[in-house]
């Protein structure tokens, strides 16, 4: 490959700060020249009719000779394309639009000197509109034979290294516009994310669920065990909380008669940031009357199967070099059975012995144990520390303790456990669902238990929500509900190691100046 000149920024290395400043000055000078010539530097009159990917697909299998024969018969395929200049080699230019890349062919003998000069002055990152007709090179590459070309936007900063994009991961997150511009993998990831969300919506609508919107700011945080973000409403002079989950509002809609509802939106939790957690995240929550948690496990299997098949073409995927099958049925395992399988040197005969559980959690697992923790809380800690990370294939863990499931219905067979499940894939939780607690007296007692934990210092415990108890008293039909983390699902389907790779603008620590 020939090495372009400096003025077109095509250097194999990232420019040093002084070089970058020089390039910025050169780009600004070019813009000044355009303005001085009387041209509109940012015109908005070009109308695109064609996309790169569509043209590549339309001419797949059509040879160079066939295209030339059509040209000779006066049957040229006229197109109007637009995009960002990614390569300018004089005879050929490569532009990129939202669907992909396509070449532009510069026929020097057919273009006037002014047009050739304009083409020569193009820099990487400039945005152009091109009218011309389709051709194919001797190497088989499809191109647009330029008849007219117009500069639509002049780039005033040099692009990142065109061969390696943004090498620094943090720089990619902070400058997602540059990452998308130069990194095909990043663009593909967010195209899949869009397909996942639209696919979920299509699936739910086909299942006769109704899409709804509920408040993002709550007077009382609820619907999950988590620490909320707090704000203040000046006009009402009251604290408000960014929602940690939409659950309680959605169940009030079921009380009102909307028997199958779902919402896709953000929730917020004022907790740690990691490869699995972002303070602002996207989830779907849905509720179905006259269903139980078994029905939702079946629905979840169908949903995951359909998404993988429609988007990836298969249910057999690879995540971080590990083969995972999303084909139904998924593994189903109770929490106690998971502890028996994965907790080393654990005496299952003492699974309900609080003293033994506390000793195992604190001594063997090195976990902090508080006096307020009951048997169910300790069982959950032991499960999370010993089993969770080992659940590689899709696995529904069922029969969670009532103590750690304040909104879930108690099991008819054992009131100490609930009709609840969580779905784990690749050692990570992707979904949480249960048959809903619709007994208002039991719900009030569980809220009081959460209040006791909060008073004992648990910042993540729930508040007592009297309005929800009142709504529940009007009668919630037998109902099952579930939440699925869309960010983690996209991580799985795109083989992304970090949640930051699948969120366009993840939260970052403020960049220090200087």
From Swiss-Prot:
Catalytic activity: tRNA(Lys) + L-lysine + ATP = L-lysyl-tRNA(Lys) + AMP + diphosphate
Cofactor binding: number and manner: Binds 3 Mg(2+) ions per subunit.
Binding site for Mg(2+) 2: 429
Matching Pfam families: tRNA-synt_2, tRNA_anti-codon
Superkingdom of the organism of origin: Bacteria
Enzymatic class: ligase
SUPFAM superfamilies: Class II aaRS and biotin synthetases, Nucleic acid-binding proteins
Phylogenetic classification of the source organism: Bacteria, Pseudomonadati, Pseudomonadota, Gammaproteobacteria, Moraxellales
Cofactor(s) the record lists: Mg(2+)
Gene: lysS
Any GO BP: lysyl-tRNA aminoacylation
Protein name from the UniProt record: Lysine--tRNA ligase
Xref: PANTHER family: LYSINE--TRNA LIGASE, CHLOROPLASTIC_MITOCHONDRIAL, LYSYL-TRNA SYNTHETASE
Locations listed in the record: Cytoplasm
Family: Belongs to the class-II aminoacyl-tRNA synthetase family.
EC number, UniProt record: 6.1.1.6
